[in-house]
């Protein structure tokens, strides 16, 4: 997927849902753990050299798996490239659990499935589709038969 560099830079400067200095190791063999400022903004994970304003990279958190590796560590790997694994080291077990949860919940697909789940619950309780008032209930991305939590 292609992204406009200026748009990504602008997005990286927005308020982060989560940010911290974490140890990070890239997917290349022999890569060493380096301290990085890591910021979660919407469904992008930006990483920066400490004390620099421009990100050195970004991961789009779609079609990926976030896994807890050990007490303080987690990884991200992409379904279409399982051999490419990004490793992260947190300062505590609690911080690690928080990051895994935040990253898992950041994907568009997770948000869409959550929307479908709550839409279905409201429909059961009220008999009304809450998306009808916005004129979008018929769009394919909002169809209930495609959603399962």
Swiss-Prot record:
**Designated name of the protein:** Pleckstrin homology domain-containing family J member 1
| Any one Gene Ontology BP term | endosome organization
Listed under GO cellular component are:
cytosol; early endosome; recycling endosome; trans-Golgi network
InterPro entries documented for this protein? Boi1/Boi2-like, PH-like_dom_sf, PH_domain
The organism's place on the tree of life at top rank: Eukaryota
- Which Pfam families does the record match to this protein? PH
Which PROSITE patterns would you find in this protein's record?
PH_DOMAIN
Domain named PH is located at: 15-108
Annotated disulfide bonds: none
Look up and give the organism this protein is from: Xenopus laevis
Q: Which gene encodes it?
A: plekhj1
Q: What is the lineage of its organism?
A: Eukaryota, Metazoa, Chordata, Craniata, Vertebrata
